[in-house]
Curated annotation (Swiss-Prot):
All copies of domain UPAR/Ly6, residue ranges: 46-137
Lipid-linked residues (GPI-anchor amidated serine): 148
Pfam families (UniProt xref): UPAR_LY6_2 (PF16975)
Organism: Mus musculus
Keyword Transmembrane helix: no
Residues that make up the propeptide removed upon maturation: 149-172
Protein name, per record: Ly6/PLAUR domain-containing protein 6B
Length: 172
């Protein structure tokens, strides 16, 4: 009986892990972008997601041109226009200088009922997300690791670890 409970617990855990992967399989994990292995054009080079007037964040990030930012830029800028219902109307992402990052935050236009939120960040491909309010429309300095030898490990979700522990507890 104990062996049967153990096999059942392991099977349920495997099903949960596999189903989690199926749920997220349709989405690209833009956070898991590794630093490029090709030589950089100059010291402290970086890349940003870049797009001009994209309709949504997914397509902006997915089809972003993969090129190094110019040497006179230090940050990634994101400009997000959206309706009062939160629907994106325009997304622009690009490499930016410090001067272009002075005007971060959100501004609501009463005439057109649209909001524009601007954010800047520092680091390799740091502009994954869209600014949507005053808490994330900020100038964020995040020093990304820029080594080509770094490896990204897959860490299971915390709730799966708790679930596994709960299944194994009766067997102990």
């Amino acid at each position: 009986m104990l062996l049967l409970c153990h096999i059942l617990a392991v099977t349920i855990l495997q099903i949960l892990i596999i189903s989690e992967n199926w749920v997220f399989a349709k989405n690209i994990n833009f956070y898991n972008v590794r630093p490029p292995l090709d030589p950089t054009p100059f010291p402290n080079s970086f890349k940003c997601f870049t797009c001009e007037n994209a309709g949504d964040n997914y397509n902006c990030n997915r089809w972003a041109e993969d090129k190094w930012c110019p040497q006179d830029t230090q940050y990634c800028l994101t400009v997000h226009h959206f309706t009062s219902h939160g629907r994106s109307t325009s997304i622009t992402k690009k490499c930016a200088s410090k001067n272009e990052c002075h005007f971060v935050g959100c501004r609501h236009s009463r005439d057109s009922e649209h909001t524009e939120c601007r954010s800047c960040c520092e680091g390799m491909i740091c502009n994954v997300e869209l600014p949507t309010n005053h808490t994330n429309a900020v100038f964020a300095v995040m020093h990304a690791q820029r080594t080509s030898g770094s490896s990204v490990s897959s860490v299971p979700s915390p709730y799966l670890l708790v679930l596994a522990w709960l299944f194994m507890l009766p067997l102990l």
